[in-house]
Amino acid sequence: PELLTKNKESLDKLLPSHIYKFRALNEYAVNNLCERTLWFDSPLNMNDPYDGHLIYENPFNTYREITPDFIETMTMLGILNDSKGLLNNLESKKTTFFDLLKKLDMDSEVLRNILATSEKIHEQGLGNFNLNFLKKIYICSFSERFDSILMWAHYTNNHSGFCIEYDISKSDSRYHFRQCLYPVIYDENIFDLTSYLERDKGSNDYNNLYIIQAVIRKALDWSYEHEWRIIHPFGTLNGPQNLSTPKPSSVLLGSNFFNSIHLIKDESQKQLQVELALKIIKFCEQQKIILNIARYSLQKFLMERDYISYDDAYRKLREL
């Protein structure tokens, strides 16, 4: 993950040729398609409660190198008096604030109160940090697969919606659709920022994009999504909004696209869905965008796609 945020050139070599956006058949999604836009929002509003969250160790429990500045600070705070004698008894050149306190002649009850208070402050600070951090980041999610049964089921209302295909290989490298595109890394652990906070900002090893690793890390449970994200971090946007997309290279209709409309009993609701479907087909025809329809594979647990002409799509709508 660190390489992905540190060296964008290396990431470009990993980019898939196409990415896919799964949509339910509703007015908002169809307008996005026809206006060539997509909605970018904070991870706070996504369907994963852990989305974008990070952790860092309690600073009082983080190992720090014993430097003259550290000793001076501890002495000024009145924590160290006989600093030379105390430091000579330390087993290594690194220690934590807690370890220093434990070596002092301090009442055990006072020490426990200090530790408990510091943990409470740390938990509150971590919560506030995550909240404020995620408020300033805006993302849009995609998949590198169109053939996932679960993606069609979860994000297109049981295969009744559609999927937009974008050809990334033809996008300008400076365009946000490619420049800000990152793969999601699936892991057992939440991203830990501690080691990066300790790095010297003046060193060649420092990169303020390290924190993006929190936004591209998700639990292993989500790995079926094969997700890629366009990420606009830290003030590049002033709020949730629609942003432009490239021209779609293809639009895939769900395997249940036409039948789901046919089964609607309320005539007014049915007519609304027919009009939305008609809008998709007309847009693809006008823009010369390939129209496909998904179908179940007969050999594997995945979706395949077949070409469908505009005329055939219009005919299927008329027959509903």
Regions found by a protein language model. Give the residues of each.
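Partner-binding and oligomerization surfaces adjacent to conserved cores of proteins
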Residues: P1-L320
